[in-house]
């Protein structure tokens, strides 16, 4: 499990779920993991570090005997060890800044150049987990940015390491799918309606040129260029975007 808002939102979702007696094998534990431990949803958690808010930090220290039975901290070379991740059969959940219609994921660089955060152990978990899931909001900046684009501006995780993509609009299970099948699943299930028609149009026109993984290279980064020029990936201001 990676850290960031989307991943924490997923953990908070377990609070009202039917899941119980969960175990977590992660790189970092945050507030949401401690809350799940307190509620009994999470039975045990393993990580290399704990990064929590001051109130949660104070609670852990005040109840250290309680938490030492439920949390273990291991060196990073163990918590992120590919062989261990693979052997445990982990369901890996990581956060994507953006992903493209074929399933390539950018986890670290805004606009392809400005680093927002490091990659951490997400590569170790994505490649070796039994099921590699990436989660993201479908849009950012009040709808001015689509998290799903024709081609990602930076690649941290290739399409070969991504099993499932999830946004609030739905999920795309990419396992066993050819590139064009992946694109159709992503556009249909993960893209916000404000951007879906434009992305479908890009894909349809790219398919007319043929190829295993169709692209329009002259337009592949046009969405990022449009944002740099107009502060929005949308061709025009729209009430739908502002309401999102």
Segments predicted by a language model, with ranges:
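Short, small-residue-biased leader/transition segments that mark boundaries at the very start
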Residues: 1-3
